[in-house]
């Protein structure tokens, strides 16, 4: 076969390929120019709650740093599973992120038969903030300390209220009962407001609830605060001891707010987003904004966040197995 026709065909193929090349942007080109459109942060809780209050100024700061809108979208329901599932199914392109309390990612997979997604489809990237629960009791009981409550369980049946099965208040109370070897009867409610109402009314004895929910009632004397669950004292109630300071030094009922993403977000996109978020997290302005909801901004590397998530998952799995906790 003559060589000249072969050469002509090869040159024609090369020319065609060169014409097509500009129309086929590479993955590297797409990540280099990120973000090209608005970014979503999914919050699997209702608006105006502590986690929602914490993320909105962060989103505004990241929006300013990256030059694209950063939109907070609330997707409440099923103890956070609905919002988490939306993130798990999203494209791993850096345009969808998750901001969630740690039980959404560290507890739900152990207590729900089906959370609606594969738990390894979401990757934790920043342990952004921590918060605690406050142990309160009806003042008519006369308890002045955690020890008073624990001692009372040995002579009478006590009840405790929570915002629902698997909620932070439920987990931390069962953790305390496990630590002390005593029992109380769990009365779950559909949210903290009705739990607080019945506790004040004397229909239930005690409970663990978030500080912003309980502070006005503590100040009015309608409930008595005994301790806070975390290792650090509450910024809202610094006079209140921790449970660790109340005779149980190993106890730690700290909860976390995690920033996470669908598995597979390119490393350079992760880096840009996380750097902008970390600057916002560590700003004094952000610390001041979240103090009224008793959240402490911390921030972390991705490795440390994943280590923390793994540690908490193991801790809560052991507890939920022990108390045979299952959610519908």
Regions found by a protein language model. Give the residues of each.
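N-terminal secretory signal peptides that target proteins for export/translocation
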Residues: 1-6
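Bacterial N-terminal signal peptides
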Residues: 12-23
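N-terminal (or domain-start) structured segment
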Residues: 29-121, 157-159, 165, 181-205, ...
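An extracytoplasmic/periplasmic, membrane-proximal ligand-sensing/linker region
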Residues: 36-38, 267-328
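Hinge/capping helix and adjacent helix->loop/strand transition within the periplasmic-binding protein
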Residues: 89-95, 110-194, 243, 256-289
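Beta->alpha turn/N-cap motifs
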Residues: 99-104, 108, 192, 209-214, ...
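C-terminal lobe and pocket-closing loops
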Residues: 118, 130, 214-283, 311-314, ...
